[in-house]
Amino acid sequence: MDAKVEDNIAGKCPMGHGRGPANRDWWPQSLRLEGLNQHAPRSNPMGEAFDYAEAFKSLDLDAVVSDLHALMTDSQEWWPADFGHYGGLFIRLAWHAAGTYRITDGRGGAGGGQQRFAPLNSWPDNTNLDKARRLLWPIKQKYGAKLSWADLYVLVGNVALESMGFKTFGFAGGRADQWEPEELYWGPESTWLDDKRYSGERELDSPLGAVQMGLIYVNPEGPNGNPDPLASARDIRETFARMAMNDEETVALIAGGHTFGKAHGAGDASLVGVEPEGGAIEAQGFGWASKHGTGKGPDAITGGPEVIWTQTPTRWSNHFFDNLFKYEWELTQSPAGAKQWQAKNAPADIPDAFDPNKTHVPRMLTSDLALRFDPAYEKISRRFYENPDQFADAFARAWFKLTHRDMGPIGRYLGPLVPKEELIWQDPIPAVDHPLADDKDIAALKAKILATGLSASDLVSTAWASASTYRQSDKRGGANGARIRLAPQKDWAVNNPPVLAKVLAALEGVQKDFNASAGGGKKISLADLIVLGGAAAIEKAAKDAGTSVTVPFAPGRMDASAEQTDAHSFEALEPRSDGFRNYRGPGKHYMAPEEALVDRAQLLGLSGPELTVLVGGLRVLGANADGSKDGVFTNRPGALSNDFFVNLLSMETTWSPTAANAFAGHDRKSSEPRWTATRVDLIFGSHAELRAFAEVYACADSQEKFVCDFVTAWNKVMNADRLDLAA
């Protein structure tokens, strides 16, 4: 096609790609709802009927593993394998695919195969992993829909370890691919490797998990390139903790990963070309072309350091710790100018990656030396050094956790390599071991719950508090397990502990009576009763508003024990802001209240209309965390009416701010006070899209639709964690 014709066509593209400012450019502070529409079925080329879990079950996993073993030593001319073995490259691929996980919001991780897309496919820390993905393409192509990229990235890391003599803990399939980039907040910076994410005494902003834009964890040269092992240890401890790793797991992962392979800094990094997303169309997504020598093999430049850690970089060993403790270290520079450390007075017994006649002295990164010079890390490292079996077990377990942390409950794990051991970080819940309540029982239980005298507000608030901890990101939280009765959830301010304790005590009484009297061994869990209490309250509230509705309910939840609950890990699920309950916790917030509302809705898997109808319903039901009247735009609280929308959109009210997140509504004519509100309430009248949804529910003929839509959205949240219902 003629270039002028191409230019003309592009200039007239009706979607305006690359032409003119978008709405977000004109109004950058406008609330964005795009995150609620991510991963819609229409973006999935497999179609809505495709079930990846079922497809994976038909996969010949042994054949895949065999093919991956063969790939490890099938060195390609276009990207030769270090030491004749791709193991180190594929360990890095798997690590970096999984290592974006952050416990603060459960986002990131290996699930979805996001490393195929920007920005991850072009992060500086992922330099040359495009080569690893291209090496895997023939295997992905061979097994097609039965093997997702997401599963393949993790599996190849396991096979790499096994092929080099390490016994892994196990592997679970079941990660379905996503088909568009995740809209995530990776940091405030607009340039790679910048670090505007800190405040105070190097306090890393939430929910971020890396020290600089475009890194997975830490700068291997030290904080901002400062080669200080103790300062590096501080960064390591913070970033690994945000990935849900303790000190022992951290030491095991760093030392285990750096037992293999090498870092590549063979020459001037300025000779490396652009990343995949910035490349020309003819490059076909192949990035970082280097003009240093051949640009590959011994001339490869990936980061900056040029380090080979051990004497056997393609075999599992204890050489990492042996070298770490045996030698003293002096600061040097790589050929690329990166700061690194070299062993003093050490023999040149490290093999070269490509020249069998060449050897090197041991080298380490600043982040490696942190494992020796930080007192807590040193103690663990020395124990691993003296007890190789403990090191191997710790690395196997930490690697499994790293690569499976975002998969959710063990019921999602697929395949013959799933380990049988129950791990506390999987948030285990007992299996159902009794007959479930039937429809007649459920009707009787609803009546008994309402007879306790608990208000609709109390019952709805408790059910919401229990279920709304769910995060579709890492599949943690939710009503199943009834962990709301355990620490730390029972003490969260957002859950109004005194009211929560009252509700739980009443429901436990109902549970005790039913379990003692029900025939046939039937039982009801507290987890089920909490959800059923919300359903009973909603049905009564709808009836009080003149609408008859039945809230769906499916028993089958169980109650987890304190021993099955890692209380420290669950602290990450505490809402610092929950617009559904008009809650704004103390301390620093990185999002405005309305942004936090949309963020929580995205974690719950809600659409814009679902978000809207839930807020409107929860307000009139009086579900505010502190019992305040903010946003309760009704003269009949407790009735499930569409009054929130009717009164919010009424031109009879004018609004004025009284504080940063507080507003007063007055009668337009008389100036008499009418309502109070927060930003989360008023956004449904201010934001054009949310107002459009609100208008639907404010219409004179919308009461029944409002109730039905509220119940549907409510049921979605209550069952968000019910893997058994989705099966």
Curated annotation (Swiss-Prot):
GO molecular function: catalase activity; heme binding; metal ion binding
Entries under InterPro entries matching the protein: Catalase_peroxidase (IPR000763), Haem_peroxidase (IPR002016), Haem_peroxidase_sf (IPR010255), Peroxidases_AS (IPR019794), Peroxidases_heam-ligand_BS (IPR019793)
Processing after translation: Formation of the three residue Trp-Tyr-Met cross-link is important for the catalase, but not the peroxidase activity of the enzyme.
Region annotated Disordered, chain positions: 1-21
Catalytic activity annotation: H2O2 + AH2 = A + 2 H2O; 2 H2O2 = O2 + 2 H2O
Enzyme class: oxidoreductase
Protein's GO biological process: cellular response to hydrogen peroxide; hydrogen peroxide catabolic process
Cofactor or coenzyme needed: heme b
Protein family: Belongs to the peroxidase family. Peroxidase/catalase subfamily.
Task of the protein: Bifunctional enzyme with both catalase and broad-spectrum peroxidase activity. Important for stationary phase survival.
Name recorded for this polypeptide: Catalase-peroxidase
Gene source species: Caulobacter vibrioides (strain ATCC 19089 / CIP 103742 / CB 15)
